[in-house]
Regions:
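Extended, folded cores of ATP/NTP-driven motor/assembly subunits in large transport
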Residues: 1-272
Length: 272
């Protein structure tokens, strides 16, 4: 019974599991990783600072009932092994393995059976004893809508009840970067002053975006006055389709994000 359920759910990730169920199954995972600038990452002061930041973030997430847990070495190795051996996962051959504490984690993430080839537009993963060859392709946004909120990212997994959905494993990364409060405030004030000058010129009557830009920077300055601030946001989409389905999956990813008013384009030479 367990094997039948597993087969049923695995099939639903790429195709409708039954004619009467036109849906796609999803096993979604969410990870949060924080990068803290430091000159000496191995210093005790830097580690204490990182532990303090982690404690604050865990407490904040608990307030919103996310109940996060801190990764250990085993979870780190298994998660990255799943990403770096996609051909094993797609062929149904990937499995958990015990972590060797005597070896560095980075030496245990890529299987000995995995062959990796770097191409201009992607990375090829293959194994000698498995038929499906996987090509990892990266896409990045080159245009965002005028107004965008994080809740719209709920559509990023595709329409599970429609025809527009990923039929291969995918990884969506959201980058959030925040500068120091004082630097951000000074930058917002300078940009706001410049935008206000441009919006007061005669040419602003013919270019409505100048008025909108002034309004946006005015709101940014007000956010700093209320103790808030600004963040820089970007996304990257990685898809892991079989080589024969790359074109279809790239167009699917572009279509999904286009419904969110985000224009994606395929990356080249990302490995450099």
């Amino acid at each position: 019974m367990t094997q039948a359920k597993a087969k049923f759910l695995s099939r639903s990730a790429t195709q409708a599991p039954h004619p009467a169920l036109p849906i796609l199954g999803r096993n979604l995972r969410c990870w949060i990783s924080v990068v803290i600038p430091t000159k000496d990452p191995f210093a005790s002061e830097a580690r204490d600072n990182a532990l303090l930041v982690r404690k604050v973030m865990v407490s904040t997430l608990n307030q919103w009932h996310f109940a996060p847990f801190v990764w250990d070495e085993r979870i780190l190795v298994h998660t990255l092994s799943l990403i770096l051996n996609p051909q094993l996962f797609v062929n149904g051959a990937w499995s958990f393995s015990e972590v060797d504490t005597a070896r560095e984690p980075r030496a245990q993430m890529v299987s000995h059976d995995t062959t990796i080839s770097v191409e201009e537009d992607g990375i090829i993963f293959r194994s000698a004893h498995h038929p499906l060859i996987i090509k990892a392709v990266s896409l990045s946004p080159h245009g965002y809508p005028q107004s965008f909120s994080l809740d719209k990212m709920a559509r990023a997994a595709g329409d599970v009840e429609g025809s527009l959905g990923f039929s291969s494993p995918f990884l969506i990364t959201t980058y959030l970067s925040k500068t120091s409060y004082e630097k951000g405030k000074s930058y917002a004030q300078l940009k706001s002053a410049r935008a206000e000058q441009m919006s007061a010129t005669e040419i602003a009557r013919f270019i409505p975006t100048l008025q909108e830009e002034a309004r946006d920077w005015r709101a940014a300055v007000q956010s700093f006055e209320h103790g808030e601030g600004l963040v820089q946001l970007s996304h990257q989409v990685m898809i892991f389709p079989p080589t024969e389905n790359v074109t279809h999956e790239v167009q699917t990813a572009i279509g999904i994000f286009k419904k969110m008013s985000i224009e994606l384009m395929q990356d080249h030479l990302m490995h450099l």
